[in-house]
Structures are given as C-alpha cells and as structure tokens.
C-alpha cells in the first residue's frame, strides 16, 4: 500500500447507504436480507478482487466485514483474525479510532481468498495492495495511510467504511524445507449433515481426536478415514449410516494453505513434508521443538438406516396432463401446454385475477396470455391413455363488459346453487370431490 490507499468508488458508494447492513449486502449482490437489523458497531466492508501479477487475470474474493469496535483478547486476535496491533485506542476527546495495520488487512484478505478455493492448484498468494485500493466513508472521504502503511478510522458515529479496489496476487509456491520435521501427529474431526430433511437429527459437538503419529511420507487412506467417521457416527447418532463424503481437508500446523483431498474418489494422503515446529517455552523464554500436527477435517452426508435418498428430480410420482384450450365455434386451438402434477385435485379451474388459485391447473380465461375476452362454455373433454391425460377446454367469447372470471363454476359469491350445478362440468372429468362437504 502506498502512502495512500487510492481509489475511485463513486459508483459503488452511490448504491451504498452507510449505517445499515442492507448496504453491505448490496455490495455482495445476491442473498441480501432486508430484515437484518441495523449495525451497532462501525465496520469496514472489504470488497476487493485479485489481479494475478504480470497478467490482467482477475481472481474473485468474497466480500467480508471487519468490526472496528471489537477488542482483541489479551494477546489474542479479533474474530476477523486481526492481531492486537489493529485495535481501537483512546484519544483525548474520548473517541475510539481504530488503527488498521496493513499486514493485518492483507492477511485477512488472504484468508478470505483461500476460503473460496476448492482444489490444491487454485491457491493464490496475496502480495500487496494494488494502486487503486482505497478506503472511503459514506460521504466519499478517502482515508490515507500513514508512513507505516496503517490507516486510522473513526468509530463514531457508527457507520460502514469501504475498502475497494484490487490486491496483487501470484500462484502459491511452497518454500523449500530447511529443517525437516521427523513425525506428525494426525488429528481428526468430523461433521455430519443429514442428506434428507430430518427434524430428528441433532448435530453433535465437533470433537478432535488423535488418530496416530506418522513419519513424513507415511500414508492414510480414504477408507481408513471413512471407517473412523462411521465409528464416531455409530456412537453419536446410532441408527444412521454414512451416505457420501462431502469434503476432506488437511490443515498443516495451522498453515492457511491446506491440502484439499478428493471427495468423489478414493485417495491416499501422504503426510506432507514441512519445517520442524517450534514454540516459546513460557517459563524459560527459550524456543523449543514441539509436535507437528495434521488436522484432517471431514464432512459427510448421512441417512437414517433403511431410508432412501431424496431425489428432487424424481418424477415417477407425477402425472402428465396435456391441456388444450379450443374456440368452441371455430375449433381453433387457442393455447396448449403439458403439465406434471402430483395430485389430480389440482385439475381445477383457476382465476387468473385471483392469486389464491395458483395451485390450480386450468384457466377460466386466457387474458394473461394476450388471448382476450374468452370465457368457459361448460364443455370439457377428458381423454386418457397409458401415459397421458388430455383435457380439452372449449371456450367462447364472453359478453361485452363481463369480467375475466365470468362463468367461474365455483365462485359461490357470484352464482346461485342452480347456476353452480349447471357449470359443474369438472365432475365429468373425474376430478376428486373436495374433502370439505361444504365445497361439494
């Protein structure tokens, strides 16, 4: 980042109304939630893309937010992963500005970039901010960086700031190992999700267990991991079985660049070569060797034993209808359509002017299709074959000035009982009698 975070974000700021979460979702595009409550703390919205160094190729990065008023725990980090260096600090007038360190911002963007990766060859490393990176407030004011690259933002009044522009990235390459680790503790955690809608399933607490200690280059197979997952499932959710693997990811010594294992085929994981891990002894202050770790995190879809997976594309239970609308005087085909429905109860007339009739399959007028002034005549033909049911509705021009729902057979508010019986032609199509006797 230069001495300033430069950018032009006028177009985006036009759509951004600072002070509400709605504006944040406007940056994100899809999925914004108008019912979310307004923000209570000032936030920095990071909406950036990556530019691959030496090319014009862009890399997508999901937008995210940084809470500018959250205090990191003693020596810890905020929920965005910012170090204690990036934190609010008191001033003489009592306001609490928030100092954002350049390194912390780049690290947060790096984590968000990695969160989108689904294969090991898709990793990019964030190098630096591009020249168009800028932080602005709701009024378009640009906040410039200090000489050390940090930016200080006010937190009062509560508002949302915007970091927009680009970061420079390059394909990630592992560094040569200088001091190789001898062994690695392989830890395991698993998460289960029901494949079918299941109100009985209660997710268990994620627990991490030590599987084994392996040397660099030793292996563990997908079958071993599957057996481990099923063993845990048998204890936490008896009566369920694993249907399929959703993901398997290995985190190496808390490195953000993880190994993504195949989810749709068998695999063998070879323990990755890496540097020997060290930590500072809190009593002596001396750097000492510590255990290297691989955390294998898996997700599986599960089913109740004996249950079949729900197939949203299964149409075996649906019935095919061909609906034809014909001019009763000329036999001209006005409109034809084929429909699939799970219930013949839907074979009833709907009023295009009444939204309560959405589930019904037949139209009492065709105005919505720009076929104007037609109405029902009471003549309906119903023909069946092995795979199809053809319903032909004969229509005629309705009297001048009559509304679109003229001759609607079940409009009890407009027609007498005698008139309703005269137009109850659907009874001849085999449509089931309503369950409610009052509707007969």
Curated annotation (Swiss-Prot):
The keyword Signal applies. One of its GO terms (cellular component) is extracellular region. Keywords: Plasminogen activation, Signal, Virulence. Disulfide bonds: none annotated. One of its GO terms (biological process) is induction of platelet aggregation in another organism. Residues 1-26 form the signal peptide. It holds the Pfam family Staphylokinase. This protein is not a protease, but it activates plasminogen by complexing with it. As a potential virulence factor, it is thought to prevent the formation of effective fibrin barriers around the site of infection, thereby contributing to the invasiveness of the cells. This is Streptokinase A. It comes from Streptococcus pyogenes serotype M1.
């Amino acid at each position: 980042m230069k001495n300033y975070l430069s950018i032009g974000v006028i177009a985006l700021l036009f759509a951004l109304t600072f002070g509400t979460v709605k504006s944040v979702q406007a940056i994100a595009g899809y999925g914004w939630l108008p019912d979310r409550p307004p923000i209570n703390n000032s936030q920095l919205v990071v909406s950036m893309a990556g530019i691959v160094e030496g090319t014009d190729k862009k890399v997508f990065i999901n937008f995210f937010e940084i809470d500018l008023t959250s205090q990191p725990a003693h020596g810890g980090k905020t929920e965005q992963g910012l170090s204690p260096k990036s934190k609010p600090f008191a001033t003489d007038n009592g306001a609490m500005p928030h100092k954002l360190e350049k390194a912390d911002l780049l690290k947060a963007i790096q984590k968000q970039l990695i969160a989108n990766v689904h294969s090991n060859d898709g990793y990019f490393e964030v190098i630096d901010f591009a020249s168009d990176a800028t932080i602005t407030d709701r009024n378009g004011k640009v906040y410039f960086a200090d000489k050390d690259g940090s930016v200080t933002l006010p937190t009062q009044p509560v508002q949302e700031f915007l970091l927009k522009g680009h970061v420079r990235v390059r394909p990630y390459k592992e560094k040569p190992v200088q001091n190789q680790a001898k062994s690695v503790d392989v830890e395991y955690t698993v998460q289960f999700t029901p494949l079918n809608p299941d109100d009985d399933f209660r997710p268990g607490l994620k627990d991490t267990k030590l599987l084994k200690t392996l040397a660099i280059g030793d292996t563990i197979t997908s079958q071993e991991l599957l057996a481990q997952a099923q063993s845990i499932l048998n204890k936490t959710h008896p009566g369920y079985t694993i249907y399929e693997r959703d993901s398997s990811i290995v985190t190496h010594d808390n490195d953000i660049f993880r190994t993504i294992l195949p989810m749709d085929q068998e695999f063998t994981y070879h323990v990755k070569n890496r540097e020997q891990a060290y930590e500072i002894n809190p009593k002596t202050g001396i750097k000492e060797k510590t255990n290297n770790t691989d955390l294998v995190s898996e997700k599986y879809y599960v089913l109740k034993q004996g249950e079949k997976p729900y197939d949203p594309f299964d149409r075996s239970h649906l019935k095919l209808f061909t609906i034809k609308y014909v001019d009763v005087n000329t036999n001209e085909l006005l409109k034809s359509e084929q429909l699939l429905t799970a219930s013949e109860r839907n074979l009833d007339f709907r009023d295009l002017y009444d939204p309560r009739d959405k589930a019904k399959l037949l139209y009492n007028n065709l105005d919505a299709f720009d076929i104007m002034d037609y109405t029902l005549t009471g003549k309906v033909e119903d023909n069946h074959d092995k795979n199809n049911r053809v319903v032909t509705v004969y229509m005629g021009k309705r009297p001048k000035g009559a509304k679109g729902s003229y001759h609607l057979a079940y409009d009890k508010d407009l027609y007498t009982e005698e008139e309703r019986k005269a137009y109850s032609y659907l009874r001849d199509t085999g449509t089931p009698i309503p369950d409610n006797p009052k509707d007969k």
